């Protein structure tokens, strides 16, 4: 499935990992991007 940002646009991060945090946690949630070294 395609994940969308807050503007409704597809999230693009070059094939790295991302984590979705719930809004009730921390500073309001968000995404964390990380490269894995195994992108294709």
From Swiss-Prot:
**Keyword annotations of the record:** Hydrolase, Protease inhibitor, Serine protease inhibitor
Gene3D superfamilies registered for this protein in UniProt: 2.80.10.50
Q: Which reaction does it catalyse?
A: Preferential cleavage: Arg-|-Xaa, Lys-|-Xaa
What the entry lists under SUPFAM superfamilies is as follows: STI-like (SSF50386)
KW Hydrolase (keyword) present: yes
Q: What does the annotation record about activity and temperature?
A: Stable at temperatures up to 70 degrees Celsius. Incubation at temperatures above 70 degrees Celsius steadily decreases inhibitory activity.
| Enzyme's top EC category | hydrolase
Looking up InterPro entries in the UniProt record yields:
Kunitz_inhibitor_STI-like_sf (IPR011065)
Q: Give the E.C. number(s).
A: 3.4.21.4
Instruction: Quote the subunit structure annotation.
Output: Monomer.
Q: What does this protein do?
A: Inhibits trypsin but not chymotrypsin, papain or porcine pancreatic alpha-amylase. Has insecticidal activity against A.aegypti. Functions by inhibiting the A.aegypti midgut proteases to reduce the survival of larva and adults.
Protein known as = Trypsin inhibitor
């Amino acid at each position: 499935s395609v994940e969308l940002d807050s503007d409704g646009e597809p999230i693009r991060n070059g094939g790295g990992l991302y984590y979705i945090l719930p809004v009730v946690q921390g500073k309001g949630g968000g995404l964390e991007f990380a490269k894995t070294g195994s992108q294709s």
